[in-house]
Swiss-Prot record:
This is Transcriptional regulator MraZ. Residues 5-47, 76-119 form the SpoVT-AbrB domain. Its main location: cytoplasm. It holds the Pfam family MraZ. It comes from Mycoplasma pneumoniae (strain ATCC 29342 / M129 / Subtype 1) (Mycoplasmoides pneumoniae). One of its GO terms (biological process) is negative regulation of DNA-templated transcription initiation. Belongs to the MraZ family. Signal peptide: none annotated. One of its GO terms (molecular function) is DNA-binding transcription factor activity. GO terms for cellular component: cytoplasm; nucleoid. It is found in: Cytoplasm, Nucleoid. Transmembrane segments: none annotated. The keyword Transit peptide does not apply. The keyword Phosphoprotein does not apply.
Length: 141
């Protein structure tokens, strides 16, 4: 399970170093894809397969389904985690997420989000309260 917030940096070679607490979870290869609100999402390959299956259940006859799948999956990348826990972020994803040097990793239970620190701070500053969102979500199943 992935929990917590981690402040890290993007090095000159476009790599991030996973914090020690996350390295065991992401051994070998990972999948990085474009997420929502200008972040990237990181999953184990088997978890990415489950994520894909959720989208694959949507009717492909609907234009929004095709568009969403293209936007998320066309730029997804399998990436290796090296023995030092470093991950090379592909240039297209760096551009999609507007990543600069300061990065924030956000645990989302089953996946990790990669945010540019400034964009994440702006997102938090403009977000509604926990209570407001929870109240609105009470009937969602």
């Amino acid at each position: 399970m992935l929990l917590g917030t981690f402040n890290i940096t993007l090095d000159a070679k476009n790599r991030i170093s996973l914090p020690a607490k996350l390295r065991a979870f992401f051994e070998g290869s990972i999948v990085i894809n474009r997420g929502f609100e200008n972040c990237l999402e990181v999953r184990k390959p088997q978890d990415f397969q489950k994520y894909f299956e959720q989208f694959n259940s949507f009717p492909s006859t609907q234009k929004d389904t095709r568009t969403l799948k293209r936007l998320i999956f066309a730029n997804a990348n399998f990436v290796d985690v090296d023995t030092a826990g470093r991950v090379l972020i592909p240039n297209n994803l760096i551009n999609d997420a507007k990543l600069d040097k300061e990065i924030v990793l956000i645990g989302q239970f089953d996946h990790l989000e990669i945010w540019d620190k400034k964009l994440y701070e702006d997102y938090l500053a403009n977000s509604e309260s926990l209570e407001t969102v929870a109240e609105r979500m009470k009937d969602v199943k």
